[in-house]
Amino acid sequence: SKQTFHADIVILAMGSEAGKLSGMNESRYHILKQLQLKVIEPLPSLVQFYTSPVLKVLKGVRVKGTFSLMENDKCIHQEKGELLFTDYGVSGIAVMQLSSFYKKHHQYQLYIDFFDELSHNQLCQYLSQQSSLFLEGMLNHKIASYFQKYQDLPIQKLAFLLKHYRLDIQGIREAQYAQVMKGGLSLEDVTYDLELKRYPSMFAIGEILNVAGMCGGYNLHFALASAYRVAQAIERNVYVKNS
């Protein structure tokens, strides 16, 4: 509306694009930059991965195991939990947790351990007893059917494949599919009370700040806790001003 308003206290509570069907709208970050504040590039977090290959034959199949985000043979982060195969890549809580560690312009791989409760040798022993019943009863039947093409591999190699199945990560899904955005107003620009150092009596709360937690309600908690922190600071300031 281009109207001008005057206020004693301003709170920046603009949120983010996470979960919004309208896609990316960086006007909130443009406002911060106009105020000469440091903005960390926003990026979807707690979001699904695009992968190669895409295992469309397993679409809708969930699997429990241990999942590792790798780069150059180095484990960036590992999650134990559940993964969901989709028609674009992978989803599930474990995948969303791993996405928190994703950075642009990096080449990541996702390694799936379908048998994380068994050591390599224990799995070899189980496989040697399967003979004609290849993986039947050991994995979801669709996953077992998918791995049928590897049944002629030596048991040692097959066991390794099942404990280190690799998918190349092609990227993360867009902001509209994310639960939260990482990036935003740098914490270097705010005080302990979330007051802008450059602009006294201006505060920032919630997802506009460069704070992003893991799954489990941590981001909702931060939104509420940051609002409470600012409310306390404002109350103190008003009390001091009026005393």
Language-model regions, residue ranges each:
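Glycine-centered tight beta-turn/hairpin loop motif at sheet-sheet or coil-to-beta transitions
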Residues: 1-2, 74
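Short hydrophobic core segments
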Residues: 4-23, 32-33, 83-88, 202-204, ...
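Glycine-rich loop(s) and the adjacent beta-strand/alpha-helix scaffold that form part
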Residues: 9-55
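Glycine-rich phosphate/pyrophosphate-binding beta-alpha loops
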Residues: 19, 48-49, 91-93, 180, ...
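A conserved FAD-binding loop/helix module that cradles the flavin
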Residues: 20-31, 35, 196, 210-239
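An anion/pyrophosphate-binding glycine-rich loop and adjacent beta-alpha core
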Residues: 37-43, 47-155
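Conserved mid-domain beta->alpha element of the FAD-binding
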Residues: 100-104, 124, 131, 201-203, ...
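A glycine-rich dinucleotide-binding beta-alpha-beta segment and adjacent secondary-structure elements
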Residues: 145-212
